[in-house]
A protein has these predicted regions:
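Short loop/turn motifs at secondary-structure junctions and domain boundaries
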Residues: 48, 110-114
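Regulatory sensory and allosteric helical modules in signal-transduction proteins
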Residues: 59-110
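Sensory-domain boundary capping and coupling elements
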Residues: 123-136
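Short hydrophobic/aromatic beta-strand element in the GNAT-like acyltransferase core
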Residues: 53, 119, 131
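A short acidic/small-residue loop/turn micro-motif
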Residues: 73, 136-137
Length: 164
C-alpha cells in the first residue's frame, strides 16, 4: 500500500524531485492508464499548493481531447485540438505556461476562478496521448521550475502506463 509523505522542500526543484520519487512508488507495478492518471492527479492536487484543478485530458481522436481523471470542480468534457490552452499544447506539441488565462487568446473558461494554467503534453515516441493540466486561482502561479517539474512527472506517468 502506498503512503503519501508530506513533502518539506526548501525549493521547487527539491519539491519536484521528492514528488517524482513518490509518484514512481505510487505507480510501480500498475500499467493501467486510467488508474495511474487518477492517482497522479490526486497526488498533484494534494501536494502542490494553490491549485484549483489538476487532471488529464486524453487525445481520443486526432482533433479532440476528452476529460480524463482529475481533482477539482467539474470540467469541460471535450476540447478541440487548437482551442484553449490544452488544445494549443497538443497542436504545438509543447508545454504551455500561462500566467494570465484571461489574456490567452481563445481561452476556455471551464472554471471562472482559474487565473493561471500549466499544460504539459503526454508524449510516447512521436504520439501525443493527452495532457496534464494544472489550474490555479492565483495569477502567475506557475513558473519554469513548475514546468520542468511537471514535464518530469509526465515522463514518469508515460513510462509507467499503457496507452489510454
Amino acid at each position: 500500500m502506498f503512503e503519501a509523505k508530506a513533502i518539506k522542500a526548501d525549493d521547487k526543484a527539491e519539491l519536484y524531485r521528492e514528488l517524482a520519487q513518490q509518484l514512481g512508488g505510487l505507480l510501480h507495478g500498475e500499467r493501467d492508464a486510467i488508474a495511474n492518471a487518477a492517482n497522479t492527479a490526486a497526488l498533484l492536487f494534494t501536494t502542490l499548493p494553490d491549485l484549483n484543478w489538476a487532471g488529464f485530458y486524453v487525445l481520443r481522436s486526432p482533433d479532440q481531447l476528452v476529460l480524463g481523471p482529475f481533482q477539482g470542480n467539474p470540467a469541460c468534457v471535450r476540447i478541440a485540438v487548437g482551442r484553449g490552452v490544452c488544445g494549443a499544447a497538443v497542436e504545438q506539441r509543447r508545454s504551455m505556461l500561462v500566467e494570465d488565462v484571461h489574456a490567452f487568446p481563445d481561452h476556455i473558461a471551464c472554471d471562472a476562478a482559474s487565473r493561471s494554467e500549466l499544460v504539459v503534453p503526454l508524449v510516447r515516441g512521436e504520439r501525443i496521448l493527452g495532457v496534464i493540466d494544472l489550474d490555479s486561482p492565483l495569477p502567475a502561479r506557475f513558473d519554469r521550475e513548475d514546468q520542468r517539474g511537471i514535464e518530469a512527472i509526465a515522463q514518469i506517468y508515460v513510462r509507467a502506463s499503457d496507452d489510454f
